[in-house]
């Protein structure tokens, strides 16, 4: 039975995988599903933040080499990826800025896959690495059902305000204007002291993966790939 390791950006995503995504995917035949913060164990930042690609690639490649029966994937925020030229730059990140919004995440995902395949050589099965890049923060997914989001965090009166934010965008995955209006910043403005890992996970469990998949096409495509891999 296959094993899945999800390389995540921060503690919020790590908790999401362990509490919400893994229980769903176990029903498709995985033997083990775990999350690992990007970078090596000595330098992990449990508050999030993306390391340079060279370091992350080494982590992913080592995992794929050490366990021939595993699948690797990522869960990272596009806007947090280093784009500057040099060893920290993530493949496809600068190119993606020249693409229409719907193509930006897939541009980076394809570049990451190509780089991993190049590193591992011709004998590597590319289906063993499924990169996933969220256009914005994890909190964007929570706007898939604003009423349940507000209820889950104990602020039911905020449902209307959350919905007003959601209605300004085509999908929850597009909620952002700049660094000051990222999804988490919008939530924190309405919920002082918002605790991302705890409240975010409570909201995800209340909203449910089915609703998020319905509202967030990139997320849906990723989960469907993970489901199909073991079928």
Where are the regions that the model predicts?
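C-terminal accessory helical subdomains adjacent to catalytic cores in phosphodiester-
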Residues: 1, 14-43, 57-231
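Charged, often glycine-rich, active-site loop that binds/positions anionic groups
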Residues: 43-55
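Catalytic nucleophile-elbow at a beta strand-turn-alpha helix junction centered on a G-D-S/GDSL motif
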Residues: 6-15
């Amino acid at each position: 039975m296959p094993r899945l390791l999800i390389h995540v950006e921060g503690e919020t995503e790590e908790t999401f995988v362990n509490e919400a995504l893994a229980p769903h995917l176990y029903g498709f035949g995985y033997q083990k599903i775990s999350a690992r913060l990007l970078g090596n164990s000595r330098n992990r930042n449990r508050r999030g933040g993306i390391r340079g690609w060279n370091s992350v690639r080494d982590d992913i490649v080592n995992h794929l080499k050490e366990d021939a029966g595993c699948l690797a994937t990522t869960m990272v925020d596009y806007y947090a990826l280093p784009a500057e030229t040099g060893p920290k730059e993530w493949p496809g990140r600068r190119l993606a800025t020249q693409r229409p919004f719907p193509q930006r995440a897939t541009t980076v995902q394809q570049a990451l896959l190509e780089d991993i395949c190049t590193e591992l050589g011709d004998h590597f099965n590319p289906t063993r690495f499924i990169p996933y890049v969220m256009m914005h923060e994890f909190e964007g997914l929570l706007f898939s059902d604003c009423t349940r989001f507000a209820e889950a965090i104990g602020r039911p009166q905020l449902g209307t305000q959350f919905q007003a934010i959601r209605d300004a965008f085509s999908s929850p995955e597009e909620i952002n204007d700049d660094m000051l209006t990222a999804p988490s910043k919008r939530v924190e403005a309405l919920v002082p002291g918002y605790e991302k890992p705890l409240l975010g996970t409570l909201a995800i469990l209340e909203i449910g993966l089915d609703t998020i998949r319905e509202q967030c096409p990139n997320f849906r495509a990723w989960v469907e790939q993970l489901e199909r891999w073991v079928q």
